[in-house]
């Protein structure tokens, strides 16, 4: 069935959940919203969409109606990928940003972190619509009922959401629409305080009545575009009307007898696959679990992966190389040879052969499994909220490069480099592909790093999903310094430092090391045997099922 060691050697506040139908999210009310759909006879996609809508209400610090989404759906026989990330307004280019924001010390146009010049077309609502049209079984309006109810009646804010909410207020409180929506008492809500989001509820009711396309055409789209126009933003009704999500073929990489699947670029999921390939060639799982030798090899593999991803990944229409070239096994084997087992190294990018959220998972007793992620990017996104509508607009445009030589250079109608990545695991048995696990780890640059670390723990070391969730994590920063959770063994940290890693021990895991949700199928041939689900204690969520 699994071959897991069900012992959990790490401190935890969660237990794995065994059930025939499961939903695992970062907020209990969102998990309950998903379960309500399954109780009504809906499928895993219905459950995932209900949970996704609910979590825009109860965790607005991470996602909202103005964000983006990606999904991987196992329909019982085939894995489908959806890219619902938005594109730049048609007016954007490097000169646009240079005129409005000047140049930096390197002569490149400056790009802001918040405000209108970070707002790309929101893709999440169109993503919900696409998923429902292809796989949903309940009426779309039914899926929004729990979210509407929570937004109108209110909910008590849990500790981690309250912490992130308070941290965002000093930077965002003066931006248009933010305080009216998210500071009804003139401040961030405290733990346990009741919050209602009436504007958000009205928008959800409009989507339930008129369909998700109403977000992109008609009165609601006009309202969004007018807000942009009044604020000096470039987003127009034409930008909204032209947007469509894309069904795409997932990419995959073999690892220890399984295939790990990710969404292809413009997302960074390929970083996890590159790192897994390099780590396997380097023999990371041949050392004891949690040993400094294993951790060092995984860290170096991740650094090599990021070096390539930051150089090559962009909107696929602008990339110089293909994902297949970046994942070429011979190329990854050569990259693995660059790792010094005794020393940390700062790597440059290679030359492949020619040729950043909330995450949730749902699965049902009929065998359908969903790996879904949505995000506003940095906290509340741009900080801009459409007045009276509760639509917090993302700041995903900050992910573009201003370097004209980069494949990720900003351009109208183009998708930026994206951090959010759902994942999935399958295996081949007797010529048939079988579903194994839907999973994801939210949290900016931590996402592919979380994928690497948890997959190595489960598939390389046989740790059960909850243990893989609870284990201490490390995070490679963009300057190649290393953050580690304070729960990591001191001997391991000292041994990594002796290898030359510049290490910062972090006592606040909630903000830095991501949060995962995992659903593992117990019997690949019989979905009625059910699943085991795990939810990360670094957020307020849980796994639930029946």
Per-region residue spans from a language model:
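M16/insulysin-pitrilysin zinc metalloprotease superfamily fold
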Residues: 269-285, 425, 434-436, 443-469
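Internal maturation/activation junctions in enzymes
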Residues: 281-376, 389, 396, 507
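Active-site rim segments in enzyme catalytic domains, especially the processed small/beta chain
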Residues: 57-74, 78-83, 234-236, 368-433, ...
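Short, small/polar residue-rich loop motifs at catalytic or cofactor-binding pockets
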Residues: 247, 354-357, 418-420
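Extended C-terminal subregions enriched in glycine
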Residues: 318, 414, 451, 460-510
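Glycine-rich phosphate/pyrophosphate-binding beta-alpha loops
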Residues: 261-269, 357-361, 371-384, 440-447
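Noncatalytic scaffold domains of N-terminal-nucleophile
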Residues: 1-32, 36, 44-210, 215-217, ...
């Amino acid at each position: 069935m699994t071959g897991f060691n069900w012992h959990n050697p790490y401190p935890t506040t969660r237990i794995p959940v065994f059930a025939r139908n499961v939903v695992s999210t970062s907020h209990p009310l969102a998990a309950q919203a998903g379960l309500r759909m399954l109780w009504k006879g809906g499928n895993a996609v219905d459950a995932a969409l209900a949970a996704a809508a609910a979590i825009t209400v109860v965790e607005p610090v991470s996602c909202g109606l103005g964000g983006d989404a990606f999904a991987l759906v196992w329909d019982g026989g085939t894995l489908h990928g959806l890219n619902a990330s938005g594109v730049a307004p048609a007016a954007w280019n490097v000169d646009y940003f240079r005129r409005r924001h000047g140049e930096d010390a390197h002569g490149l146009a400056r790009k802001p972190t918040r405000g209108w010049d970070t707002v790309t077309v929101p893709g999440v609502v169109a993503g919900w619509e696409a998923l429902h049209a292809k796989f949903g079984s309940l009426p779309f309006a039914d899926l929004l009922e729990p979210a509407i109810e929570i937004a109108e009646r209110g909910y008590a804010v849990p500790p981690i959401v309250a912490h992130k909410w308070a941290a965002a207020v000093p930077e965002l409180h003066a931006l248009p629409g933010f305080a009216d929506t998210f500071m009804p008492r003139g401040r961030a809500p405290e733990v346990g305080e009741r919050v209602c989001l009436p504007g958000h509820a009205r928008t959800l009711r409009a989507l339930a009545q008129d369909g998700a396309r109403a977000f992109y055409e008609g009165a609601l789209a006009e309202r969004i575009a007018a807000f942009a126009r009044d604020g000096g933003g470039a987003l127009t009704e034409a930008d909204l009307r032209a947007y469509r999500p894309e069904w795409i073929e997932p990419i995959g990489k073999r690892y220890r007898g399984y295939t790990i699947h990710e969404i292809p670029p413009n997302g960074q999921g390929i970083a996890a696959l590159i790192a897994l390939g390099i780590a396997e060639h380097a023999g990371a799982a041949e050392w004891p679990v949690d040993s400094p030798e294993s951790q060092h090899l995984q860290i170096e593999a991740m650094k090599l992966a990021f070096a390539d991803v930051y150089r090559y990944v962009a909107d696929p229409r602008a990339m110089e190389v293909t994902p297949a070239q970046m994942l070429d096994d011979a190329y990854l084997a050569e990259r693995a040879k660059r790792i010094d087992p005794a020393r940390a190294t700062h790597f440059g990018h290679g030359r492949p052969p020619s040729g950043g959220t909330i995450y949730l998972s749902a699965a049902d007793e009929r065998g359908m499994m969903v790996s879904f992620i949505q995000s506003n990017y940095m906290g509340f996104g741009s900080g801009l909220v459409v007045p009276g509508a509760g639509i917090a607009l993302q700041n995903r445009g900050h992910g573009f490069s201003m370097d004209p030589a980069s494949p990720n250079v900003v351009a109208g109608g183009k998708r930026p480099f994206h951090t959010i990545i759902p994942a999935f695991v399958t295996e081949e048995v007797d010529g048939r592909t079988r579903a194994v696990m839907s999973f994801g780890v939210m949290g900016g640059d931590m996402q592919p790093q979380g994928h690497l670390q948890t997959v190595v723990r489960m598939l390389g070391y046989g740790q059960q999903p909850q243990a893989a969730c609870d284990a201490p994590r490390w995070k490679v920063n963009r300057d190649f310094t290393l953050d580690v959770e304070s729960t990591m063994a001191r001997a391991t940290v000292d041994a990594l430092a002796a290898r030359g890693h510049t290490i910062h021990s972090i006592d606040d895991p909630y903000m830095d090391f991501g949060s995962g949700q995992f659903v593992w199928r117990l019997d690949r041939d019989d979905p009625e045997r059910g699943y085991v689900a795990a939810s990360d204690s670094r957020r307020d969520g849980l796994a639930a099922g029946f």
